[in-house]
Design a protein with these regions (language model features):
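Carrier-protein-dependent adenylate-forming modules in NRPS/ANL systems
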Residues: 1-17, 29-206
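Intrinsically disordered, charged and Pro/Gly-enriched terminal/linker segments
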Residues: 17-24
Length: 210
């Protein structure tokens, strides 16, 4: 500072090497800078199923499900969704509360190669209508209790707890999505107040898990 009295404080690096390393660890900068792995979310999940199938994958509301159980349940849903024409490049809306079933639905959609569009059941009807019209899902996965909110939208509705899901095979699908495929479409409020959909690819998620 004495050497250059005109130098601005904002241009000076006041952290030592140890402090900089600590800041980078807190910000997970390494995850953002390293190249994305060549795996999709279902591929990373499949590796974990093989590695520790009996471990608890999800716990919510007093319920727990193992990686094997989550894998088989999501496979059943994926097979049913495919029978309804769901596949890569398409979107499936999820009108579900936070629950074990919601995680099953997410994995089931991802295994088809489609992207999921999460919708909080607490949103007003106007917001629900906007997201459904804007996202253009081919199927909506929900529960019997929430199905009435989808009346009049002309969409195929799948009950996550329905007999049609449980009658499907639990065998794995033969094709996995590409890491560059869109994993999900999340809607933000937008600067104008109009919800805006942001597409997130698989590799944006998996690089944080490596």
């Amino acid at each position: 500072m004495k050497a250059d009295a005109t130098r601005r404080l904002l241009s000076m690096d006041l952290d030592d090497d140890d402090e900089r390393a600590e800041w980078e660890e807190w910000g997970n900068r390494a995850a953002l800078e390293r190249s994305a792995p060549s795996l999709s979310i279902p591929e990373l999940f499949a590796e974990q199923v093989v590695r520790d199938p009996g471990a608890v994958a999800v716990s919510c509301g007093g319920r727990s499900v193992s990686y094997r159980g989550l894998d088989e349940a999501s496979n059943r849903l994926a097979h049913l969704l495919i029978s309804h024409g769901v596949g890569p490049g398409q979107r499936v809306a999820l009108l579900l509360s936070r629950s074990v079933e919601a995680v099953v639905a997410i994995m089931g959609v991802l295994k088809t190669g489609a992207a999921y569009v999460p919708i909080d059941p607490s949103v007003p009807d106007a917001r629900l209508r906007f997201v459904l019209c804007d996202a253009g899902p081919v199927v909506v996965v929900t529960t019997a209790e929430l199905a009435d909110r989808l009346a009049g939208h002309g969409l195929t509705v799948v009950d996550i707890d329905g007999r049609a899901v449980y009658s499907q095979p639990s065998a794995a699908l033969s094709v996995m999505p590409h890491p560059d495929d869109v994993a999900y479409l999340i809607y933000t409020s937008g600067t104008t107040g109009t919800p805006k959909g942001v597409a997130i690819p698989h590799h944006n998620v998996t690089r944080l898990l490596e």
